[in-house]
Amino acid sequence: MNGEQQLDADAGSGMEEVELSWEDYLEETGSTAVPYGSFKHVDTRLQNGFAPGMKLEVAVRTDPETYWVATVITTCEQLLLLRYDGYGEDRRADFWCDIRKADLYPIGWCEQNKKTLEAPEGIRDKVSDWDEFLRQTLIGACSPPVPLLEGLRNGRNPLDLIAPGSRLECQAFQDSLSTWIVTVVENIGGRLKLRYEGLESSDNYEHWLYYLDPFLHHVGWAAQQGYELQPPSAIRHLKNEAEWQEILAKVKEEEEEPLPSYLFKDKQVIGIHTFSVNMKLEAVDPWSPFGISPATVVKVFDEKYFLVEMDDLRPENHARRSFVCHADSPGIFPVQWSLKNGLHISPPPGYPSQDFDWADYLKQCGAEAAPQRCFPPLISEHEFKENMKLEAVNPILPEEVCVATITAVRGSYLWLQLEGSKKPIPECIVSVESMDIFPLGWCETNGHPLSTPRRARVYKQRKIAVVQPEKQVPSSRTVHEGLRNQELNSTESVMINGKYCCPKIYFNHRCFSGPYLNKGRIAELPQCVGPGNCVLVLREVLTLLINAAYKPSRVLRELQLDKDSVWHGCGEVLKAKYKGKSYRATVEIVKTADRVTEFCRQTCIKLECCPNLFGPRMVLDKCSENCSVLTKTKYTHYYGKKKNKRIGRPPGGHSNLACALKKASKRRKRRKNVFVHKKKRSSASVDNTPAGSPQGSGGEDEDDPDEGDDDSLSEGSTSEQQDELQEESEMSEKKSCSSSPTQSEISTSLPPDRQRRKRELRTFSFSDDENKPPSPKEIRIEVAERLHLDSNPLKWSVADVVRFIRSTDCAPLARIFLDQEIDGQALLLLTLPTVQECMDLKLGPAIKLCHHIERIKFAFYEQFAN
């Protein structure tokens, strides 16, 4: 099953992809959005074309048949705040109106349409001669254009006037100042897809510009500025001169009404530059904005425009990249700007060294550096900061807009990492005033496609997916392929689904279940839980585990919130029922996906079961911890909580496990502690239990004569316990790897009652005192023959040591050797005290491990000492 099928299966089981939630995405990534007001070009687009001070003829509110002059006080999208002329500074009569619904007309409309122009009642007595008042107040007045009012009345935004098919004039910004007609193919929120007049869509010369781009103008601009209309050099070769002139003549004959010039009133005003030919500077190549390189002013067109060429020291036959600039063009810097800002400057192609030096380069070229005064002042006050999110145009694929993260800010320039791009690209450099960047949500608002990172895709959770195990056994090939894909994909799913989205948590019921959990009940659990929110998924997992325990209240106590916790997660109240009593305790659960794997592992260790019993990884036929060699009677050798140097709880640090049935009056005298809990803190936990809680480990211990760490050790064996004993006996029979019978093998030949008695005695010998040496039978080594080594252990690597440990019955300890990077030399130096201290092992496992180390030492002296 491939990755796509896996994703589809997930969606079908309870997850469906929905629109991107920016609030959730920002929370997951730990970032913030760039403030909306930082994008001036977008803010301008939202203006309705009106400006404070404009005058209109407006219907009088108390008498709709009459009209009067009103002044625009302020604007807010489609709303205007108006004040009738004559009220002066009195704001009490100000009123709001909706442009699309109100009767608003330009000055002179009433006279043309023979409508009554009369002052409202509230001010009629203030002025004696209203005709003279109007003549004075309308001197120099500005009124909105008629097309604007008509368009707004029809529900159209001013920007909507730039409709597909509209014509504009576009300057060639690559190598010359030639201007040519372009046709609007698409307008998405002011971002225009343009096609040169005379070309078809199949010619692949369409390009994107924002409508306020300084190189885009209304039709007639070239004639006003004295520029000739001619196709840019990039497309000139596609037709001969006669064909281009024919196209131009056809456009002029059609005489379409040009787009109103007021649409471009907010365009940047081009100032006068002071650059001269042969000046050197630093520049960002607009066609490849991924670095800063040396460049040269190669041509000055006029007082407003000049041509910059990226330096290239290779032979002349290489194509040169140039672009037209003006005084305020972004992406050009004075010499040494990169050095002053701690940035790397890329040497020009053909430069003999990777270490570029401006002084040597200027001397070599015989050129001068452009003085600082030629460059516009940098914008120091802006709201762009590192790790903020925005939307940005992909400079390689201009039709694509991606989510972007600001990775660096230098003055008024940003380094952006685009996420979710069809083709991965390096960080690109843009100005804070670039018209190719937009606030988060711009694409969604304007219907523009947005490329989002995979981990940002939000899935709506119908319910936490619980996959039940199949009753029908599939073919072995299908099973193995499916499991392999799940194992490969499980580690990636944490990042794919976001910071707070937990991957599937698998219950690997074939793994060692430890002393608290019933193997039979675990086998009945769902195959997996999730994916979904970390807290919800892990809460469900822990609830299922608690219910699969011999004593749910005991497992709940093991899982309860610890004051020394390092997870910094959230506390969730979980419940357990045992023998008619309800218990609840606060359990800490991690909130982020990156901690799920370790949380599951540590929880398994806390419950003294195989670290792979549950987690994001599905175990195949063989567990990596080699837990199949373990039985319930041996759990103390391998897994257990490791509370370093902590004897009992601190004062007041009692268990937070509370019983729903408070029976303080029935509190009995606690019996002598014959069976001390294996956890060091348990005795203190008993002493400090609140009066309202059941005594001992939450209350159930007082009622049971079989008080031990494990309900399976009780006198009255239940059906689950018998099943457990039978499973362990079968496991021991399959194991049989030694010439002499092992302790577990001997137990299989005994009657069930003998087995139970034997199990109790053996386990009690460990839970009585964890530092008490085990009996000789208990530490009996299954493989006692002399060890023969194929290589010198002094030269073993960490991997060699781990490989050897995994081959023994101490396989679960191999991870410690890997984590502590114990190689062959370190292995030969280990002794029982150092093993106990450094590896934090109990005496039983430490003795068993040291036995294997002694075997290695003996073989070393015998085979390699000479």
Swiss-Prot record:
Stored CDD domains: MBT_SFMBT1_rpt1, MBT_SFMBT1_rpt2, MBT_SFMBT1_rpt3, MBT_SFMBT1_rpt4, SAM_Scm-like-4MBT1_2
Polar residues bias locations? 683-694
Supply the domain comment.
The MBT repeats mediate binding to histones tails; however, in contrast to other MBT repeats, does not bind specific histone lysine modifications. The MBT repeats lack the conserved Asp and aromatic cage at conserved positions.
Task: Mention one GO biological process in which this protein takes part, according to its record.
Answer: spermatogenesis
Oligomer and partners: Interacts with MYOD1. Component of the SLC (SFMBT1-LSD1-CoREST) corepressor complex, which also contains KDM1A/LSD1 and RCOR1/CoREST. Interacts with KDM1A/LSD1 and RCOR1/CoREST. Interacts with L3MBTL3.
**Tissues expressed in:** Expressed in all cell lines and normal tissues tested, including the thymus.
Quote the subcellular location field of this record. Answer: Nucleus
Write one Gene Ontology MF term. Answer: chromatin binding
InterPro entries assigned: Mbt (IPR004092), MBT_SFMBT1_rpt2 (IPR047352), MBT_SFMBT1_rpt3 (IPR047351), PcG_chromatin_remod_factors (IPR050548), SAM (IPR001660), SAM/pointed_sf (IPR013761), Scm-like-4MBT1/2_SAM (IPR037604), SLED (IPR021987)
The UniProt regions of compositional bias labelled Low complexity, in chain numbering, are 737-749
Q: What is its main location?
A: nucleus
Q: What residue spans carry the region label Disordered?
A: 641-777
**Is Transmembrane one of the keywords UniProt gives this record?**
no
Entry-linked PANTHER family = POLYCOMB GROUP PROTEIN, SCM-LIKE WITH FOUR MBT DOMAINS PROTEIN 1
Which positions does the record annotate as the modified residue Phosphoserine?
S767, S775
GO cellular component terms, alphabetically, are: nucleoplasm; nucleus
Q: Which residues form a coiled coil?
A: none
User: What is the protein's name according to its record?
Assistant: Scm-like with four MBT domains protein 1
Q: Give the Acidic residues compositional bias ranges.
A: 699-713, 721-730
Q: Which UniProt keywords apply?
A: Chromatin regulator, Differentiation, Nucleus, Phosphoprotein, Repeat, Repressor, Spermatogenesis, Transcription, Transcription regulation
Each MBT repeat occupies one of these ranges, namely 20-120, 128-232, 242-348, 356-453
List all Basic residues biased stretches.
663-682
What segment(s) does the record annotate as region Antigenic epitope? 34-42
Record bears the keyword Ribonucleoprotein: no
Positions of the SAM domain: 796-864
